[in-house]
């Protein structure tokens, strides 16, 4: 049995974090040699005998112009004798990537030569020389245990390079105040524990728990925050690579909790030590004098206020101006002394009345799940959101009282055991699992084998919202040519979204380089890996000096600033292919051009609970599933990209239980032929012409010169018809004022934000249109009490007011006070992810569509699939030269660079080894036929039975086992 989640973990500050920090500070000062070793990268280069690969070029890009300075170490479990670098492929190891945890055979500790940004010459890094010895020291053993595997890549001559990095030491300085220090995170809890895993039956398939998870949960270590309110909760996803090159995908939610009193006492003692060592007598005297003056002014103000209160009790109508003047002077002095003391905050005791009191110390805790399956991220993310909402339920808004009580009584341990042990992994297709998560239900499923893996789990919207289409094409070209790609952002959540989206756009190719969506600060040396990689890191600790320039091009993308910088020569697509891609992407994602969405990361990637409201994914909240429409879209022309395949409103407040009413959602026609009459009627209504639907969409005149404001309005003819059965959503917007009462001569209204009002025909009533996150919001007036009866605001759950707004495309209804809460996009009106995938899929079909014409032995096994010397350019059974020559005539010379990539080699290798009916091969082949047949079989066309096989689709819903705590509650009742 295999469960959805392999492990649950809780990471944060341990009770002895102050002593751990001090001991590490002393150890770092005593042993500088340990710091030099920690920044090196180990390369394991061995021949993989049973699985041969295709070698594309005689000079691999992984070896060209890369110089290594070897630091050799010998020992029983460390590394072997020093050998020439290119001789490691003579190893007799048959499974080099499946090593034991502490096996370092045929490895060498290497320090990479860093190349200057302004010069082409390489200068070696200065490291301490290390002499070989028979037994590893204590420091070496500690570093070997704390190594981090970051991935394995394939090179020429059937070599695999396994990269292992050592975390850098945490930089600490004696002059740093304890409140400003960064503390190393610790693993506070894991489930199942190591003991439980040993006692599990062999039938349970569970991966080992990595020992470096806390470092990825807190990539920039932990800081202590002092605030009156709870800091904003965040979340992010990350990927880990084990010693056998298998990937482990994690996602965690960071929740801030009040620091326990015992930890506060330890911290205050450390602050006293810091004040004694880092403050002078003069500083303390000045601080004490200012503090004494502040207390004097406060006591004086109290006495003056008491006198004023006595006069008011005596019934005196006149106000003494002298008394008022004295009160004003005291208040000004208090403000002055407080501001003077604020820079000297750390030189005072922690609790100072009026300056430091009533402020809580907050520490972060990371609650996370680990899974071997990358396409269950949406489910795990929403599961963690609901579970962690019980920790800060009092800080969230618009939770019904019944759900609030359920959250407060939620047994976290019981739900963790349920998701890790009881809830089975759903098969690909066939069924959905209904999983109980406190007061809500979530639905877990995996796409059938005849659909693109993860097409409905990978969220492409954040990448396309943050970057312009030309910048996205630069990233696509870099990934296609296997360059180095670095994502930068100030929030960790955006890094995971962008990295995963870029990999998803490469289908049917598979990324073969290193993949680290979130890189911890201590692993900054991973930038020196001499191979292709996709790495995401926080922008405020990234420096170009950390990235050596070599023969592999480098692309640095700042997701917060919509900027892409390239270093080195990246092979560009031909002008015709690039222009077609850009034109089709603009039709599929008009969010910036037609819906005025700014270029920046969306808010739901920055916060776990945007605007203190629990928002959930539509993928996990409904038992109905969006149809896989890519085969049908392949037959469409680009002009048909504006058609909507379905209408769906976002879930802005999961506690409104909209998932219990799936009939209020418009989905595309389900593939099951046994449809009910209601679903057929629903589909007929969806396919009806737009003017026949029950929602208003009057013509809209685009402003001639749109401003850069977030909200934009226009005026058009008012229609009182309101779309029914629409899904409401829970977010809010600034109050809009009536055009009749606020319209001025220039035709604009004052709403607190920039407004554009387009004049309408004389005699017609004006209606305001505003755009928020791709939603075209129209002001709706309730003409009769029966209008919108039973409808609620999608954010608050309150009844809709007499004046509210409604989205013309998805039917979202929100009261005016909650428009600013709209943080989820209007899909597919402003962004259609399936059409995005179709655009890139058509590109690959055009490039790779004729690949089978150059395969001479399609059923050849990989053991015999290799380089045939003297074969005139034949790579195994694939005629590489002929394919490149023919494709270059049509698409340009960049094809040769694509064919030299390892991703293309894997694509061809899979089709030479696997059977034609294997889903990994048949899916792309039949999508190719689908595009050639214009989406459906014709008289002389070929059928696509694999894509049309309804037996592979999701046909039923099963209820997963509920947590033990709920079973006990049901038994009591």
Swiss-Prot record:
GO molecular function, one term: diacylglycerol binding
Cellular component terms (Gene Ontology): cytoplasmic vesicle; cytosol; nucleus
Transmembrane domains' residue ranges: none
Localization in the cell: Cytoplasm; Nucleus
Residue ranges with Polar residues bias: 69-79, 739-750
A Pfam family reported for this protein in Swiss-Prot or TrEMBL: uDENN
Domain dDENN: 588-919
Modification Phosphoserine, positions: 134, 318, 726
Region (Disordered): 69-136, 693-713, 729-750
Keywords associated with the record: Cytoplasm, Nucleus, Phosphoprotein
Residues in coiled coil: none
PROSITE patterns documented for this protein: DENN
Protein name according to UniProt: DENN domain-containing protein C297.05
Species this chain originates from: Schizosaccharomyces pombe (strain 972 / ATCC 24843)
